[in-house]
Amino acid sequence: HSQGMFTNDYSKYLEEKLAQEFVEWLKNGKS
């Protein structure tokens, strides 16, 4: 099992999570 693979998947997951939270934050700020 490659450490780099895990790190890559994890950072991808974090980016998606952050993007979703950012969109929610934008929605809440605009309304």
Curated annotation (Swiss-Prot):
PROSITE patterns: GLUCAGON. Induction: Produced in the A cells of the islets of Langerhans in response to a drop in blood sugar concentration. One of its GO terms (molecular function) is hormone activity. Keywords: Hormone, Secreted. Pfam families: Hormone_2. It is found in: Secreted. GO terms for cellular component: extracellular region. InterPro entries: Glucagon, Glucagon_GIP_secretin_VIP. Glucagon plays a key role in glucose metabolism and homeostasis. Regulates blood glucose by increasing gluconeogenesis and decreasing glycolysis. PANTHER family: GLUCAGON (PTHR11418), PRO-GLUCAGON (PTHR11418:SF0). Belongs to the glucagon family. This is Glucagon-5. The lineage of its organism: Eukaryota, Metazoa, Chordata, Craniata, Vertebrata.
